[in-house]
Amino acid sequence: MQLYDMPDKRGHFGPYGGIFVAETLVEALEELRVMYERYRHDPDFLAEFAYDLKHFVGRPSPVYYAERLTQKAGGARIYLKREDLNHTGAHKVNNTIGQALLAKRMGKPRVIAETGAGQHGVATATIAARLGLECVVYMGAEDVKRQAPNVFRMKLLGATVVPVESGSKTLKDALNEAMRDWVTNISNTFYIIGTVAGPHPYPMMVRDFQAVIGTEAKQQMQELIGRQPDAVIACVGGGSNAMGIFYPYIDVEGVRLIGVEAAGHGIDTGRHAAPLTANSPAGVLHGNRTYLMQDENGQIIETHSISAGLDYPGVGPEHAWLKDIKRAEYVAVTDDEAMEAFHTLCRTEGIIPALESSHALAYAMKLAETMSPDQALLVNLSGRGDKDINTVASLAGITL
């Protein structure tokens, strides 16, 4: 079996990825690529990254056998990779630490970020405070409303939060504004992208920093059950938590990789955020080519998901490639199914999951039913649900 080795030198995953940006950004991206190549195997850099993951984030995060959830679903045993236990409450911090350490080495005193659910913004503000960097976070005005607690957290951590009023006022618009800021302040600013999208080298770099999830999980599954799971399941918006757990498994035969997108109100309604499941045509967004929700004129279609972190019209280019080469499968789960899984995990395991992660849980429970008890599923529980209790309460007609 030929070992997986992507992207190519120009940042392409087959026909996806690449660098589609304004001329003004090309030089900055080249500088970033050169610096990342220099440091990605540098022992001092890796030692500092490992130190922060252990002592600041609290890694390794455990793999946990969800016994009562397994009983409720019936069938295969369900294991959870507990990224919700990380400092700041999600997988996002793994990547922000890696990029912030790089920013420091590049002599950039200011970092900027885009955020949807607010988790990446909080993680960026956190590490900026830890390293003494100025921090500005762009967030769609709609998401600012949905995620008020995270907005306040970022401000507590010393970040400036800029609500973006253009377009659909969500993640894609925040990304556009962050890109504009970067072009303007290129000499002193490092752009910390939160997902495996954007122009090369971001999709590769974010994946590499998140791969600690899958690397740990492989070892933990071996210790727990003496083998690897039959399938690894993760939610996919941009897709960094999924890439982080998938990547170390790509060359492992017999392990299915399943990405779960947001079906919103249903794929057939058009009100969703599932470009892979819907087989959306490829297009260019935020500096890379990928599957993209667009109309016949190539205009981006507004997306919908109950979860702010999955509410994105594109997807990381590596996911697009893994779908095409059939190494990963992509499915979608509706708002209602995700909500049901959210409540189920709360009541069976005493864990309040993020609404993003609840999409992966919903599909895992469906799949487990069709399998035998001697089989095992590993779900990436990408984040905790504290940030979502306002959304869940308001759907139940409760004001907090």
Curated annotation (Swiss-Prot):
GO terms for cellular component: cytoplasm. Pfam families: PALP (PF00291). Pathway: Amino-acid biosynthesis; L-tryptophan biosynthesis; L-tryptophan from chorismate: step 5/5. InterPro entries: Trp_synth_b_CS, Trp_synth_beta, Trp_synth_beta/beta-like, TrpB-like_PALP, TrpB-like_PALP_sf. Coiled coil: none annotated. Its cofactor is pyridoxal 5'-phosphate. Tetramer of two alpha and two beta chains. This is Tryptophan synthase beta chain.
